[in-house]
Amino acid sequence: MQPDRLDLHALHHFRTRSPLTHCMTNDVVQTFTANVLLALGASPAMVIEAEEAEQFAAMADALLINVGTLTAPRAQAMRRAIEGAMAAGKPWTLDPVAVGALSYRTRFCQQILSLKPAAIRGNASEILALAGMSAGGRGVDTTDTASSALPAAIALARQTHAIVAVTGEVDYVTDGQRTQTITGGDVMMTRVVGTGCALSAVVAASCSLPGDRLNNVAAACGFMKQAGSVAVKESRGPGSFASAFIDALWNLEAQA
Amino acid sequence: MQPDRLDLHALHHFRTRSPLTHCMTNDVVQTFTANVLLALGASPAMVIEAEEAEQFAAMADALLINVGTLTAPRAQAMRRAIEGAMAAGKPWTLDPVAVGALSYRTRFCQQILSLKPAAIRGNASEILALAGMSAGGRGVDTTDTASSALPAAIALARQTHAIVAVTGEVDYVTDGQRTQTITGGDVMMTRVVGTGCALSAVVAASCSLPGDRLNNVAAACGFMKQAGSVAVKESRGPGSFASAFIDALWNLEAQA
Amino acid sequence: MQPDRLDLHALHHFRTRSPLTHCMTNDVVQTFTANVLLALGASPAMVIEAEEAEQFAAMADALLINVGTLTAPRAQAMRRAIEGAMAAGKPWTLDPVAVGALSYRTRFCQQILSLKPAAIRGNASEILALAGMSAGGRGVDTTDTASSALPAAIALARQTHAIVAVTGEVDYVTDGQRTQTITGGDVMMTRVVGTGCALSAVVAASCSLPGDRLNNVAAACGFMKQAGSVAVKESRGPGSFASAFIDALWNLEAQA
């Protein structure tokens, strides 16, 4: 995948497969995550009670685990969902929000890391912390650049056999051997809550598609970068940007 | 009510009564639901702790029970709220999200169905499942058309004495004897999360109004169809559609 | 601070300090609250499990406690967070949503009132109830004007040593001795869910800034009033208003 190049083949694939994506995500980004998935043609569903989460993870095409507003009951339900997904052979993706900075979620993420995630998507601080190379940033913000965390991402991919996406001004997606670089987007994406979390949901969905998973995850990053580049031209601030971003995802082919 | 005809009398009634609507709804659609109710002149409130839910349901004009992100504590609080509403003679409305597909919520909804809901609003798969006529779809999506579920809706209305709205490309609202048909809207409404759930909140609010409840619920469906028809002309994708939809609800009279 | 005058010095201060604001707020307004803080240059984070809430409150610059969708586990986590903030010398702000109308949250807020909040932001009914001068309104709506609650606000400020902001068509901010008045804004702000709750988050963040706290809280109210005045001119209803409001916060200096 070349920088700044939208992967129209992967996009077409994504839209026609319409992956049913089970999102166990944080309370702040649920609506935006669902609307991002809908704009790309996927089918989002949020199911959180432990019994149902396990049942639904087996029915869905993909599972997202995002620990942004983790609680003890949610952690238990997430474990059940991961078990349901694994038993059914469905891929699950981890978004380790603020791991490193906060102890409870750090322990939880380290525990579930052994349950073979298909992909991991985080910012530099989170990937560094998850790889055991840093004590992390001050919460959800990253204090490192994505490139500085690329060695950690590669090490984490080799350790877990997951595709690891470390994202920021530039995104890097690696399987531990090959690394793809995705540029584009705009800094305005950091002034709207949930763009990173929603990207993780798109990554989760993309892991359910056939074909090369590294390519699929890189393509997912590319969808969001491209939409960000388009939306910033249509907006006067982060409010209109958020709407324009969803519109841009909807119209990606036409704008390519 | 004629197809494609906005019931301005019901709308005026809705706006001047400004029903205080207690929404116990899912985590994904809370903001959108509140903003839909506000745009129509109603007063939304979300109260979820069991003790408070029971107390508030008695104070509010109407109660919505939406099981989209049901949990065990929430189920208990919902029971208490229904008891509070019933003791105070206030109507409650059920949105049986994904019933049929998931076991825990299916059991819960079957149990509370005996507590005399004033109205039930669901898609075809959900109404079929609730009426015991289908095993349901794959989660929140429906795999049936609303018309195919009309016999189930009529049977469910006769069984429960609730007004049943089975909604989709065309909406059908029935009391088991009479059925009203509401057309209009746009497929874009399915690409924004929460339009169905928000409709259920408007249905709940409309059940608190005096007059014929079948007419009031059909009018509620008509408000949303009309706003969808207007909004799609003002939008370039589901992001701008969501904003335009709220604006259209706000401006319904002027556009009629 | 003069009425209708944007405090550009305070705004610059706010943006350059970028306070990390720990929001324990209700389920309905999380996204909007985060986006308001981001548009003003602050850094929001929602952390809710008790252990993490205590840990994070000590790391953050400011803590917001909003009881809109209070539950028993959340109440326990909020106590822990307040303890964490106090032990680290960080200010916390209370938004007593619907206090007076609902018993459980009223008891909770009266208990935590002794834990020395830096600021309290509510509507007239809530401030009257918290000061023990009223039985409260019908939930989240206020049935009193802010000016009618000014004596209660002054009494509450003297009792708690907090800055008290009682907001509505006109906002009053008092430390019990001095009172500042903030005008502007638009009634459309009451038709978008979360403007009051988001203001409380901005108040919380502003309490972390050096300088006179009364001025800082009044400036926070002024940011929101000014954005509301600008946004209403750019919008056709509450949907476009919500986007325009976020844009206006982002562009406050340019529009001043």
Swiss-Prot record, chains A, B, C:
The record ties this protein, via InterPro entries, to:
Hyethyz_kinase, Ribokinase-like
Per the record, the pathway is: Cofactor biosynthesis; thiamine diphosphate biosynthesis; 4-methyl-5-(2-phosphoethyl)-thiazole from 5-(2-hydroxyethyl)-4-methylthiazole: step 1/1
Q: What does the record give as the reaction this protein catalyses?
A: 5-(2-hydroxyethyl)-4-methylthiazole + ATP = 4-methyl-5-(2-phosphooxyethyl)-thiazole + ADP + H(+)
Keyword Repressor set for record: no
What cofactor does this protein call for?
Mg(2+)
Domain of life of the source: Bacteria
Q: What is its EC number?
A: 2.7.1.50
Biological process, per Gene Ontology: thiamine biosynthetic process; thiamine diphosphate biosynthetic process
* Signal peptide residues on this chain, from the entry's feature table: none
Gene3D superfamilies (UniProt xref): 3.40.1190.20
Disulfide-bond pairs as recorded: none
Judged by the first EC level, this protein's enzyme class is transferase
User: What GO terms are given for molecular function?
Assistant: ATP binding; hydroxyethylthiazole kinase activity; magnesium ion binding
Q: What does this protein do?
A: Catalyzes the phosphorylation of the hydroxyl group of 4-methyl-5-beta-hydroxyethylthiazole (THZ).
Name of protein: Hydroxyethylthiazole kinase
What gene is behind this protein? thiM
